[in-house]
Amino acid sequence: MNFGFLGTILTILLVVGFITNVVLAFVIIFLERDRRTASSTWAWLFVLFVLPVIGFILYLFLGRTVSKKKMEKNNGDELNAFEDLVQDQIDSFDKHNYGYINDQVIKHRDLIRMLLMKQDAFLTENNKIDLFTDGHKLYEKVLEDIYNAQDYIHLEYYTFELDGLGKRILDALETKLKEGLEVKLLYDDVGSKKVRLSKFKHFRALGGEVEAFFPSKVPLINFRMNNRNHRKIIIIDGQIGYVGGFNVGDDYLGLGKLGYWRDTHTRVQGEGIDALQLRFILDWNSQSHRPQFKFDQKYFPKKIGDKGNAAIQIASSGPAFDLHQIEYGYTKMIMSAKKSIYLQSPYFIPDQSYINALKMAANSGVEVNLMIPCKPDHPFVYWATFSNAADLLDSGVNIYTYQNGFIHSKILMIDDEISSIGSANMDFRSFELNFEVNAFIYDEDIAKQLRQAFEKDIEQSKLLTKEVYDKRPLSIKFKEGLAKLISPIL
């Protein structure tokens, strides 16, 4: 064997790898600086130079960003009416001409105005909201609503598995297609990795439309592992909407290896559905190769049926957005809290400013409660979550680890007044990389229901104490340290 020749080849590969990494470092530092945080930049530089070849491969899958132009294609002037509505609402807050009947709207007008800086986060009142924390009860209602649909059904999901639950929903959708209804389904290509468009042959033959979000251009490999559509939305006839944390699949009914699945989802009736419909149309048009999906009046009908008193803003965020609205909304809520904060997130990897906000709240006398899982579904993410949560112990934050299965709920509630429920975790991936949607709800009844659900969860959780945390073995300390170091790219 010619070891000299092999050595030469290896040297050439290492030199090429080093030069490639230098070029990528230049791109990350100078060409993508407006799309990355400092922590993300440093994390990628660390990976590139510590792991020259592997770092390049990781960058291909995880490091690239998405352009705003790509996400806004096919929408043209259709957004003008919504932009005018948002501007009118901003003007009303600036001029103190409120005209709103909800007391929490006036009290939290600063948060509302901030969220209005995105065209789809307009404020609506008179919404009726139902909360779901159990997958079986949620999808029983979803299936009932699908079978009662009269005009159209739109679904957008990060994970849409074609297992027991997925097939039941697909069967219901195909039944409605046979009745002549319009049905559109948008799923994420990575989140629904077991699903391919070919699986929907019968659905499409019946007239159903389906699109994959950022599909792979190479069989079996998707080079865009980041920038995924993590949203979970259903709109039925413009009268009923769903948004929250549950995906579609048997795992979310508690039938997977993680056991019982604890999540939070909302069913909305009222004007807030228009914002969900807008979000769906924008996302569909960004991925579809068909003619533009028009903002037809039938998708924004006059609302009928039960009306409630809840005010809602539907806030979206993603890598193509100028402002990280959901992250800003979370932080503003924390800084506004006077009495209590209730947080649930399966992944807790925010930046230091977010952690500092929680510390300041706790040190100011606000009761701060955070609930995270007791078991990992992604090991590195779990150890980073555990480390970040424990960082709050010295400030008096109550940290609970949920024991009854896996908690996937993403909620923030303050002062028994306002809350946020949706798809966004409290981590860098949700704040910076993925496309997310959350409902910011200004309603005391919903806030109190969330607190009661949280208190029920405490009964099936363990309180993490400083004494217990300090006794963790060296192996766990090592895992936490490594996970925290690379957390900006997890």
Swiss-Prot record:
It is found in: Cell membrane. It catalyses: 2 a 1,2-diacyl-sn-glycero-3-phospho-(1'-sn-glycerol) = a cardiolipin + glycerol. The active site is at H230, K232, D237, H408, K410, D415. GO terms for molecular function: cardiolipin synthase activity. GO terms for biological process: cardiolipin biosynthetic process. Signal peptide: none annotated. It is a multi-pass membrane protein. Its EC number is 2.7.8.-. Pfam families: PLDc_2, PLDc_N. Residues 225-252, 403-430 form the PLD phosphodiesterase domain. The chain crosses the membrane at residues 9-29, 42-62. GO terms for cellular component: plasma membrane. Keywords: Cell membrane, Lipid biosynthesis, Lipid metabolism, Membrane, Phospholipid biosynthesis, Phospholipid metabolism, Repeat, Transferase, Transmembrane, Transmembrane helix. The keyword RNA-binding does not apply. PANTHER family: CARDIOLIPIN SYNTHASE, PHOSPHOLIPASE D. Belongs to the phospholipase D family. Cardiolipin synthase subfamily. This is Cardiolipin synthase 1. It comes from Staphylococcus epidermidis (strain ATCC 12228 / FDA PCI 1200). The lineage of its organism: Bacteria, Bacillati, Bacillota, Bacilli, Bacillales.
